[in-house]
C-alpha cells in the first residue's frame, strides 16, 4: 500500500484541497480519491486557528469512518476539542476559539451532527498508526522507539505533546527536547506538531508540519517514495511560530 501523509492542517481546507490535487487526488465526488488507490493519512490537528475546521472534520470523518479510505492519528488540538465536545472544562484559547466560534454559529441540530462525528472519529482512531508491516508510524508529535507498541499515559503525553521538559517559552508554549536526534529505530516516524519551515529529516524521522496555519506551507509525504510535496499557505506569515528546535 502507498500512502500520502498530510501534516497539520489546522482548518486550512483550501490548502488541503490544493495539496491533494497536487498529489493526484480527484475531488469530483466531493472527497479526495486517488486513481491509483493511494491512501491519505493525517498526523492530527486538523482543526483550530484556520478558517474551515468544521469542513475538515466532515471530510476526515467521511474518509476515515464512513469510507475507511484513510488513516487519522489525533493531535493535542484534537484531544482538547474532544474534551470540549464531552463537556469537560477546557480553556477556549490557543486556536480552539476559532473552531468553537464556527460550531456555535451552527443551528443546534447541525451542532449535534458535527459533535457526534468528531467524537466518533476521535474514539475510533488509535493514538498512532503502525503501517506497511511496521515500516512506518504515523503519529502527531513523534514517538520514541521504546514506546512503540505502548499506549499508556506516559506514551500518550509524548505522542500528543512531544518530549516536553516542563519548562515554558516566553509565549507560554512548552520547551521540547529534540527526541528525533536520539531516535535509533528502524521504522520511519512521520509526525508534525512543531512548525518547521521545511520538512525535517533526522535519522528515520520526518517532521512534516510546515506551518500552514502560520503562513508557511502544507506538506504531504509520499510513502514509500519518501518524497515531500508542499503548497503555499494563503495566510499571513508568523515568523515567531517557526522557533529553532533545541
Swiss-Prot record:
What is its cofactor? Ni(2+)
Q: Give each disulfide bond as a residue pair.
A: none
Against CDD domains, the record matches this protein to:
MPP_Prp_like (cd07423)
**Reaction catalysed by this chain?**
P(1),P(4)-bis(5'-guanosyl) tetraphosphate + H2O = GMP + GTP + 2 H(+)
Which UniProt keyword terms apply here? Hydrolase, Nickel
**Per its UniProt record, what InterPro entries does this chain match?**
Ap4A_hydrolase (IPR050126), Bis(5'-nucleosyl)-tetraP_PrpE (IPR023937), Calcineurin-like_PHP_ApaH (IPR004843), Metallo-depent_PP-like (IPR029052), MPP_PrpE-like (IPR041780)
Offer one Pfam family short name for this entry.
Answer: Metallophos
- GO molecular function list: bis(5'-nucleosyl)-tetraphosphatase (asymmetrical) activity; nickel cation binding; phosphatase activity
Q: What does this protein do?
A: Asymmetrically hydrolyzes Ap4p to yield AMP and ATP.
Name of this chain's protein = Bis(5'-nucleosyl)-tetraphosphatase PrpE [asymmetrical]
Q: Which organism is it from?
A: Bacillus cereus (strain G9842)
Please state the gene responsible for encoding this protein.
Answer: prpE
Amino acid at each position: 500500500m502507498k500512502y500520502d501523509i498530510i501534516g497539520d492542517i489546522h482548518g486550512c481546507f483550501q490548502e488541503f484541497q490544493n495539496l491533494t490535487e497536487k498529489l493526484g487526488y480527484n475531488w469530483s465526488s466531493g472527497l479526495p480519491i486517488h486513481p491509483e488507490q493511494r491512501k491519505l493519512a493525517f498526523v492530527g490537528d486538523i482543526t483550530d486557528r484556520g478558517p474551515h475546521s468544521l469542513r475538515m472534520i466532515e471530510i476526515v470523518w467521511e474518509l476515515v469512518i464512513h469510507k475507511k479510505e484513510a488513516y487519522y492519528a489525533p493531535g493535542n488540538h484534537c484531544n482538547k476539542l474532544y474534551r470540549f465536545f464531552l463537556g469537560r472544562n477546557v480553556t477556549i484559547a490557543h486556536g480552539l476559539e476559532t473552531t468553537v466560534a464556527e460550531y456555535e454559529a451552527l443551528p443546534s441540530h447541525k451542532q449535534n451532527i458535527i459533535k457526534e462525528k468528531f467524537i466518533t472519529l476521535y474514539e475510533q482512531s488509535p493514538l498512532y498508526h503502525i503501517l506497511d508491516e511496521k515500516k512506518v508510524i504515523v503519529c502527531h508529535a513523534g514517538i520514541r522507539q521504546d514506546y512503540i507498541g505502548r499506549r499508556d499515559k506516559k506514551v500518550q503525553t509524548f505522542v500528543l505533546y512531544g518530549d516536553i521538559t516542563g519548562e515554558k517559552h516566553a509565549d507560554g508554549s512548552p520547551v521540547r527536547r529534540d527526541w528525533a536526534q536520539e531516535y535509533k529505530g528502524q521504522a520511519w516516524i512521520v509526525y508534525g506538531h512543531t512548525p518547521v519551515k521545511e520538512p525535517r529529516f533526522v535519522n528515520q524521522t520526518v517532521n512534516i508540519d510546515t506551518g500552514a496555519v502560520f503562513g508557511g506551507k502544507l506538506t504531504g509525504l509520499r510513502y514509500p517514495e519518501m518524497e515531500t510535496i508542499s503548497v503555499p499557505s494563503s495566510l499571513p506569515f508568523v515568523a515567531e511560530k517557526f522557533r529553532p528546535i533545541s
